[in-house]
Each structure stands twice: as structure tokens, then as C-alpha cells.
């Protein structure tokens, strides 16, 4: 029987306490980051910088100088997209295959350099009943645009959660018609290449 993991619903507790504890449990080895991932709650909201140091996830409030990737989530979409994904993935499988945006923490310097050349925002538009939830990913030098991203990935919540679990790859969902790419697909492909 698997242990029930309590997932906090505030971004501060989730990022500063829960996520580092999950990394510690996962034992990701002695990997250190080539740079930081910036997590932003709302387009002009609170920010946290995340990085790996000898396998431990360090999360600090504010923007680090060496940000590689930005993840922006509207405040109202944090629980439905981030917390819900954590709840369905808790305790199952490899952490890095579950949390897409966190994968960038382990990339090497060469891939980090390639990621820095990406210009544009990839924004998931996730259909959740009557609501559309959004989470945007952009390289460090590009300001994220949730309203008019250069590339939009549209899917149902169930498919988004499958991606987060690591049980479906985005390209598999594109091929089956369950994930629709609108706009510049090249941006999504360039970002994806940095993770593999």
C-alpha cells in the first residue's frame, strides 16, 4: 500500500518545503544545475529560483542571475495544474520523468546554452471542465506571454496529467490528436530537445 503524501496548496510551502523534500526522497544523486529555473506565480507575482546542488533541490525567493528557464502559472491555476499534478504523481516512478519543468535542472552546460537561444513562450492551455488552465514556459531571456504565446499546446486535463506522470510523451499525444499545437511548433521542439 502506498503512503499518502500531503501536498500543500500554497506556492510558498509547495516550492520551499514540499518539492525539496520530494527531491531528497527521490535521491537524484550528486547532480548540480548549470543554472536556475525561475517559477513565477502570476505574470507579475511572487518568484522563486530553483537549482540542484549535489542532488539537493535548493529553492530561494526571488530571481537568480543565472536563470535558464521560466515557468509562469496564473495564481488561480496553481492548485489545478501544479498541486493536482503533484498529487497524482506522488510516490510513483522517477521524479524527473514526472515534473517536466524540473528536468531542466539537470541539463549540462551544452544543452543550457542551446536553451538560451530559444525565443518565445510555450503555453499549455489545459481544458479543465469549463475552465482553461494555463502554464507557460519560456527561456530566461524571453518575457513569458500567457495571453499570446508564440506556441500554444492545447489538451484536456487528463492528458496533461499523463504527461506529468511520465506515462505519455507530448509527441505521442500530438500523433494521436489529443494534444494540439497552435503557432510556432519549432519553439516547443527546441525546448523539448533541451530536456532529452
List each model region and its residues.
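Feature captures hydrophobic
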Residues: 1-196
Amino acid at each position: 500500500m502506498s503512503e499518502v503524501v500531503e501536498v500543500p496548496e500554497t506556492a510558498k510551502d509547495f516550492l520551499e518545503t514540499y518539492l525539496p523534500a520530494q527531491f531528497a526522497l527521490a535521491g537524484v544523486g550528486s547532480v548540480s544545475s548549470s543554472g536556475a529555473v525561475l517559477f513565477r506565480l502570476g505574470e507579475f507575482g511572487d518568484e522563486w529560483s530553483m537549482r540542484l546542488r549535489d542532488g539537493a533541490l535548493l529553492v530561494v525567493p526571488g530571481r537568480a542571475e543565472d536563470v535558464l528557464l521560466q515557468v509562469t502559472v496564473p495564481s488561480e491555476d496553481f492548485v489545478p495544474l501544479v498541486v493536482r499534478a503533484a498529487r497524482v504523481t506522488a510516490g510513483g516512478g522517477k521524479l524527473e520523468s514526472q515534473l517536466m519543468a524540473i528536468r531542466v535542472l539537470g541539463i549540462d552546460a551544452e544543452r543550457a546554452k542551446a536553451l538560451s537561444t530559444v525565443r518565445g513562450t510555450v503555453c499549455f492551455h489545459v481544458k479543465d471542465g469549463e475552465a482553461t488552465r494555463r502554464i507557460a514556459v519560456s527561456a530566461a531571456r524571453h518575457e513569458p506571454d500567457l495571453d499570446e504565446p508564440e506556441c500554444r499546446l492545447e489538451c484536456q486535463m487528463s492528458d496533461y496529467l499523463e504527461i506529468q506522470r511520465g506515462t505519455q510523451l507530448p509527441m505521442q499525444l500530438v500523433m494521436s490528436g489529443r494534444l494540439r499545437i497552435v503557432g510556432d511548433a519549432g519553439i516547443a521542439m527546441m525546448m523539448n530537445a533541451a530536456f532529452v
